[in-house]
Amino acid sequence: MAMRAKGIRKNCQHLWRWGTMLLGMLMICSAAANLWVTVYYGVPVWKEATTTLFCASDAKAYDTEAHNVWATHACVPTNPNPQEVVLENVTENFNMWKNNMVEQMHEDIISLWDQSLKPCVKLTPLCVTLNCTDLNTNNTTNTTELSIIVVWEQRGKGEMRNCSFNITTSIRDKVQREYALFYKLDVEPIDDNKNTTNNTKYRLINCNTSVITQACPKVSFEPIPIHYCTPTGFALLKCNDKKFNGTGPCTNVSTVQCTHGIRPVVSTQLLLNGSLAEEEVVIRSENFTNNAKTIIVQLNVSVEINCTRPNNHTRKRVTLGPGRVWYTTGEILGNIRQAHCNISRAQWNNTLQQIATTLREQFGNKTIAFNQSSGGDPEIVMHSFNCGGEFFYCNSTQLFNSAWNVTSNGTWSVTRKQKDTGDIITLPCRIKQIINRWQVVGKAMYALPIKGLIRCSSNITGLLLTRDGGGENQTTEIFRPGGGDMRDNWRSELYKYKVVKIEPLGVAPTKAKRRVVQREKRAVGMLGAMFLGFLGAAGSTMGATSMALTVQARQLLSGIVQQQNNLLRAIKAQQHLLQLTVWGIKQLQARILAVERYLKDQQLLGFWGCSGKLICTTAVPWNASWSNKTLDQIWNNMTWMEWDREIDNYTHLIYTLIEESQNQQEKNQQELLQLDKWASLWTWSDITKWLWYIKIFIMIVGGLIGLRIVFAVLSIVNRVRQGYSPLSFQTLLPNPRGPDRPEGTEEGGGERGRDGSTRLVHGFLALVWDDLRSLCLFSYHRLRDLLLIVARIVELLGRRGWEVLKYWWNLLQYWSQELKNSAVSLVNVTAIAVAEGTDRVIEVVQRIYRAFLHIPRRIRQGFERALL
């Protein structure tokens, strides 16, 4: 029996040992598998966005005396050392045809033109009948002038008309007769038969369709470079691929704060003073197969175009009423000559050849034909632009009148409608003073006449082309100059940029967990409070309201931001009174956006308990359903952008869990701080605490009585099972003896029993003492046994661990010695082989050397044999 008990005890010891080891391994594995959400602030993550851009411009780039229509004096100064950071191993998608920067620049230019013309004079009183005749001046050309000047004089005749009309003076009921010179394109006949050549009655061309506003006297239309900049929290991504076609992925990406200087040149057909391609000519279109889409051509070498208005004009003032002055052309000094532009024929032909080469690559090696515009408004049919304040409309037929094809031997075959004459292409130009404003329908502008001669020089850096439709089987593709939509002009410069919003907050799994006060209670009512307004919790209790502080703080911030937006809208609505330009509004918006982005990020960090931290651990366990990748795959093989796309659908959920965890932590800390009342012993004797003392005493007494009853019942049940019948709690209960302990006799024989009969204790204090003693002894024995088992396990694990370490140390020493011996042996063998090889090489060299030395001797011996 004893042997059996000993065997059972031994088996139990093995079971305890293996069970404890398995439990430890399970705990280690479970601890290793636990991952926790960690917050990172400042991660390089961005997302496509649209935001308000503000402008920067060089303060010295414009004349301080004249007000340029672009209002660059309201822009911030440019950064003398702009920073551009190249993003290594980054591929980003760009789309120049769906770029909000283009729309924003278009709206800005419209607003600038509107604001520039708002205070200027309306020319409604000029919508009267004009009696006009062709303007002729005395021809003072002498015989020494060049023949080409005479030709231009003949072309210039009939371009201007001398008109007289009645106008109201400062006194309303008084009319006076005035005269003025108008360009032929600015007036139209009002006779019934407009095709006759002897019409004398005319009117301004836009009187029946548009409201004409005269440009203010000191407004300059000279384009000034404008840099578009992003506010803090946003950035510009720039594509640096030299052959980027405007859409698709770009592998050479950098980030900048501002664009390069973009000149807002309003022109058609030809793009002037823009940026050039770095290598070969680049063509861009939203869809090359759709002939309705404009093709933007970017040249790699600019072509200079020089334009002139030879006439020496004077300016005349006509008073239209109180405070309203109309400026018109007074007279022309000298000969009337037509305005014109000159382009080098060789440069232009070389440019067309490069464009044709690029177009042939795109459209299947067909013949590339350039033809004149197919018709439309004068702005579309002719190359229109501003030169020195005057608006030129130049006939570009001579530029687009050729067909280009490659012959079988690889040379270019060029067919022209007109033969080339001279080294210079001269484009005849006409000037208009009443301009259809390209940005607004139903409004026109009267450009003031410019005194003196006008000359301007520009660089052609691109073209706007349209392709004629037709079948796929045709052998010739016809391209015509286009334009008119100024968005294409801005798009030709903004194609390489896109606006992104920086997302500095990132979450990722790590093994680090925030140490928190452990109290597994959830914040009751938190989810319901999410739907309450900022003031919706005013009627709730203070406890319920305190659970929704996060929601209220968020709504408070959004209220501040909304208020700022309302103020901005009010300022924008009253900018004509405040004299704010569109750039001033944008700067205010940019500053508000920067503050808003910063406050939002700091607000989230504050909600999560991460204020002022770049890396912040949390108590939120990582859910494998968000991403089941391992830590090595995440941290060693993925960028922050890839990781953000991986968990983008769960980011809001993770943020919510972090907020709930932080709220629970703060509630637990609050309850823990309430326990500090026990540190104040002076309040223990307070009369208000007596009821608590009595309640605690009653609970202790009740617990002891209940415990005593339980023990008594268990004792009775145990003795009943052994055959005793307890008649009373005062019955003496004999303690059983063992089989080897005989009872005593009357003669005193035998051993005196040390264990006599005992009776149940009686009395309240005796019962309490006996029960407490039994409970303490039981707890002591169990704890002692547990500590012995733990100590034995620790001792065993320590001994086994030490043996394993010694084994690995001996194994390491053994293999180190083996590697050392192998290395020494390898070095010895190598040295022997090298020595033997060296000896052989030396021996061969010596033999060759001796052979060379013996050559004279062998020759002498040969001669001796020959003589013998």
Curated annotation (Swiss-Prot):
User: What segment(s) does the record annotate as region V5?
Assistant: 472-482, 474-482
Native source organism of the sequence: Human immunodeficiency virus type 1 group M subtype B (isolate CDC-451) (HIV-1)
By sequence similarity, the record places it as follows:
Belongs to the HIV-1 env protein family.
GO terms in the biological process aspect are: clathrin-dependent endocytosis of virus by host cell; fusion of virus membrane with host endosome membrane; fusion of virus membrane with host plasma membrane; positive regulation of plasma membrane raft polarization; positive regulation of receptor clustering; viral protein processing; virion attachment to host cell
In this entry, the parts of the chain located on the Extracellular side of the membrane are 34-696
Identify the keywords attached in UniProt to this record, alphabetized: AIDS, Apoptosis, Clathrin-mediated endocytosis of virus by host, Cleavage on pair of basic residues, Coiled coil, Disulfide bond, Fusion of virus membrane with host endosomal membrane, Fusion of virus membrane with host membrane, Glycoprotein, Host cell membrane, Host endosome, Host membrane, Host-virus interaction, Lipoprotein, Membrane, Palmitate, Signal, Transmembrane, Transmembrane helix, Viral attachment to host cell, Viral envelope protein, Viral immunoevasion, Viral penetration into host cytoplasm, Virion, Virus endocytosis by host, Virus entry into host cell
Which region ranges are annotated with the description V4? Answer: 394-429
Which stretches of sequence are listed as region CD4-binding loop?
373-383
Q: What is the lineage of its organism?
A: Viruses, Riboviria, Pararnavirae, Artverviricota, Revtraviricetes
Residue positions of motif YXXL motif? 724-727
Q: What is this protein called?
A: Envelope glycoprotein gp160
GO MF entry, a single one? structural molecule activity
Write out the ranges of the annotated region (V3). Answer: 307-340
Record topological domains on the Cytoplasmic side: 718-868
